[in-house]
Amino acid sequence: MNIKQLGWNAHFESHFENYRGQDLVPARVIRVGGGFYTLLGADGEQTATLAGQLRHGSTQDALPAVGDWVGIDSPQEGGIRIHAILPRQTALKRATVSNRKGLVEKPGVPQVLAANVDIAIIVCGLNRDYNPRRIERYLTLVHESGAMPLIVLNKSDICPETQARRAEIESIAFGTPVLVTSAQCGDGLDELASHLKAGSTLVLIGSSGAGKSTLLNRLACAEHQQTSEISAAVGKGMHTTTHRELFPLPGGALVIDTPGLRELHLWGESEAGLASTFPEVIGFAAQCRFSDCQHDQEPDCGIRQALHDGTLDPARLESYLKQRAEIASATLQSELAAQVAQKRKRKTIPRQGKRWRREHGDGQ
């Protein structure tokens, strides 16, 4: 397989020059699980593990994620090893979520959902999944990643208010395309397929039951991902997709399917994404007399004036303030985690020195 068909471009070519003398070859991560990485490259599909320096010296967000390009060695007795991860063009990150016991395993460390994505397709069902405020959160995530957002309102066949809901989402999308589809009936799929360019990488993100895997199956004309029925009584989807995986489509595009996101906590470095999602709020805030205006009791507040005039939706302001507070909290967590890591490192270095002297003597 030609690696250009997998999204290889001049960016990755230039960064890989540093590794050509190390007898490494490039491959793309298509699946991650159990400490193993499934790769796709010129030699087809292969399975690899991390080389020691990557396994022990990388934070969670620096480990290979689905969509990453990596440098691997030739098959050895111990299997194929990943020795390098090429710099990402884009990365969808969220704050680390709690596990099933309700505990955050690595607070302050982001989780990479997908790497090197050109277009992030935000899929929202037109059933009980429909939630404009949640779509705003996804938009902040995608804007911050560097990928282009595309909103898909799926399941139009069961919604009598399709056009009204499309208009509502367009009013908060600020230029982001909004498509209406029915994965079951095939409506709107041609328009969606027009965004799938050969060599481009897209990711499907959204809640469980929004129809991501069904859309993928229709676009691929094959049952790539098993899909589950939705309970008509509660409108909730079963978590059919249990892992993130990249699929090459017949037309040449590459699509990453993801499990439904139980939690979508914003990462601390999301200020730019927040501004792109709420440009009208930022614009009104710029009209405040004071640069540090809290939009409460200060005189000449652009935000309060916009609320009074009816030119700013109170729900939009509330959503903006909630996201801003969450990002500030995540930033603080990240800073605290960095301080803890630095202290741990300072303690580790003397211990390593003592161990070396015990093993090799004091050099006298």
Curated annotation (Swiss-Prot):
Q: Where is this region: Disordered?
A: 339-364
| Comp. bias regions, Basic residues | 342-358
> Which co-factors does it depend on?
Zn(2+)
* Compartment(s) of residence: Cytoplasm
- Cofactor: how and how many bound: Binds 1 zinc ion per subunit.
Question: Which residues are GTP-binding?
Answer: N154, K155, S156, D157, G206, S207, S208, G209, A210, G211, K212, S213, T214
Which is one Gene Ontology cellular component term of this protein? cytoplasm
Function statement? One of several proteins that assist in the late maturation steps of the functional core of the 30S ribosomal subunit. Helps release RbfA from mature subunits. May play a role in the assembly of ribosomal proteins into the subunit. Circularly permuted GTPase that catalyzes slow GTP hydrolysis, GTPase activity is stimulated by the 30S ribosomal subunit.
* Subunit text: Monomer. Associates with 30S ribosomal subunit, binds 16S rRNA.
Write down what this protein is called. Answer: Small ribosomal subunit biogenesis GTPase RsgA
Which organism does this sequence originate in? Syntrophotalea carbinolica (strain DSM 2380 / NBRC 103641 / GraBd1)
